[in-house]
């Protein structure tokens, strides 16, 4: 068996990635989220595949086809709610995974980090298009508002929006193409994940100390396979409690009303995992400025290696930057809350303050904190 595992061209790849992979001996549970994201992706692809067998991407029948899945298809309700809440679990794991990367300085593995940012954009695009497919009120108006943002691009904006819509409004053509893209993107994401892993295995994993761990590696299996399995059990338990007991808690009641272009919902808002970016978008009165801030809120992650001023990699032994980091986390939670609130006093000013704080902490305060710590610790 050992000979096959190490010699067979295909099994050898799996062996080097998941079995004999040299792994730091001290990585904590924060390193579980990579494998949990892989699990989420598999769950989403499988449930999505079964949903696609019964779904029709036509404005006249899309809403009723989703109702048909829930009422008439065997365990259709379960598949539908697993897919909807699976997206939420996916984003929870994603945010924790990125947060871990920021905390422990994993952004210094530049290829892996940039690949991760591309993956984040791809997953966000997939989730947005998936939200449009049930063709409820929030699906329709969310698609209208978000795609309309592209009209802020000078000269080509309006033409671009009409090209994406396939007409002069969000309609049948838009729904059909969104379904096509929503179906193909997870497979593209799977390919990008393999590239992400390829880059990661070039350098090896980071660890909680941020120090080089070449002298102290252990094989991935059985040590981390069993540790990941515990994470999988906890995730699945949380996931099934959410899906079976509170399936609609993260959704929007407006999406149980069929799409009506003549009736605008009182508060148009995206799913909870986009609310922080939506709050940043809304906090700028100018349309183009808002769109740029929205894109930059994610793209700012790509300049993190340039903003790293500390002589230490991780925040483990850096209390000042740690404080900044947790203020940033609190700020993101405030932005998420604001994104779901109506555009009125005092939410407008809170959103603007939180948006400025978000960029200021990353670009100004964390690099300054790093330099201060270098001086305190006399690390010239």
Curated annotation (Swiss-Prot):
Pfam families: Cytochrom_B_C (PF00032), Cytochrome_B (PF00033). A ubiquinone binds at residue 201. Heme b b562 binds at residues 83, 182. It is found in: Mitochondrion inner membrane. GO terms for molecular function: metal ion binding; ubiquinol-cytochrome-c reductase activity. It comes from the Eukaryota. It is a multi-pass membrane protein. Its main location: mitochondrion. The chain crosses the membrane at residues 33-53, 77-98, 113-133, 178-198, 226-246, 288-308, 320-340, 347-367. Heme b b566 binds at residues 97, 196. Keywords: Electron transport, Heme, Iron, Membrane, Metal-binding, Mitochondrion, Mitochondrion inner membrane, Respiratory chain, Transmembrane, Transmembrane helix, Transport, Ubiquinone. Binds 2 heme b groups non-covalently. Its cofactor is heme b. GO terms for biological process: mitochondrial electron transport, ubiquinol to cytochrome c. Gene3D superfamilies: Cytochrome Bc1 Complex, Chain C. Belongs to the cytochrome b family. Component of the ubiquinol-cytochrome c reductase complex (complex III or cytochrome b-c1 complex) that is part of the mitochondrial respiratory chain. The b-c1 complex mediates electron transfer from ubiquinol to cytochrome c. Contributes to the generation of a proton gradient across the mitochondrial membrane that is then used for ATP synthesis. Heme 1 (or BL or b562) is low-potential and absorbs at about 562 nm, and heme 2 (or BH or b566) is high-potential and absorbs at about 566 nm. The cytochrome bc1 complex contains 11 subunits: 3 respiratory subunits (MT-CYB, CYC1 and UQCRFS1), 2 core proteins (UQCRC1 and UQCRC2) and 6 low-molecular weight proteins (UQCRH/QCR6, UQCRB/QCR7, UQCRQ/QCR8, UQCR10/QCR9, UQCR11/QCR10 and a cleavage product of UQCRFS1). This cytochrome bc1 complex then forms a dimer. This is Cytochrome b.
């Amino acid at each position: 068996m050992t000979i096959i595992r190490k010699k067979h061209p295909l099994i050898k790849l799996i062996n080097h990635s998941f079995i004999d992979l040299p792994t730091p001996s001290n990585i904590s549970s924060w390193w579980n989220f990579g494998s949990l994201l892989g699990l989420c992706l598999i769950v989403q692809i499988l449930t999505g595949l079964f949903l696609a067998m019964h779904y029709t991407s036509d404005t006249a029948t899309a809403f009723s086809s989703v109702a048909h899945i829930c009422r008439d298809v065997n365990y259709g309700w379960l598949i539908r709610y697993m897919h909807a809440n699976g997206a939420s679990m996916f984003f929870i794991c994603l945010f924790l995974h990125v947060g871990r990367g920021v905390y422990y300085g994993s952004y210094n593995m530049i290829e892996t980090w940039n690949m991760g940012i591309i993956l984040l954009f791809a997953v966000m695009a997939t989730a947005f298009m998936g939200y449009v497919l049930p063709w409820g009120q929030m699906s329709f108006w969310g698609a209208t508002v978000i795609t309309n943002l592209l009209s802020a691009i000078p000269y080509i904006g309006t033409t671009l929006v009409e090209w994406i819509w396939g007409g002069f409004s969000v309609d049948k053509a838009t729904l059909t193409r969104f379904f096509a893209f929503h179906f193909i993107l997870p497979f593209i994401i799977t390919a990008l994940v393999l590239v992400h892993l390829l880059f990661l295995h070039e350098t090896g994993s980071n660890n909680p100390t941020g120090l080089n761990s070449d002298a102290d590696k252990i094989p991935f299996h059985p040590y981390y396979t069993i540790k990941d399995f515990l994470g999988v059990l906890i995730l699945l338990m949380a996931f099934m409690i959410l899906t079976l007991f509170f399936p609609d808690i993260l959704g929007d009641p407006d999406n149980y009303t069929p799409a009506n272009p003549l009736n605008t919902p009182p508060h148009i808002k995206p799913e909870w995992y986009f609310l922080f970016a939506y709050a940043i978008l809304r906090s700028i009165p100018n349309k183009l400025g808002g769109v740029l801030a929205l894109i930059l809120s994610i793209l700012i992650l790509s300049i993190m290696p340039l903003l790293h001023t500390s002589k230490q990699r991780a925040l483990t032994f850096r209390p000042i930057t740690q404080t900044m980091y947790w203020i940033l986390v609190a700020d993101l939670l405030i932005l998420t809350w604001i994104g779901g609130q109506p555009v009125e006093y005092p939410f407008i000013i809170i959103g603007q303050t939180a948006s400025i704080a978000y960029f200021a902490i990353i670009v100004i305060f964390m690099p300054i904190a790093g330099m201060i710590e270098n001086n305190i610790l006399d690390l010239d």
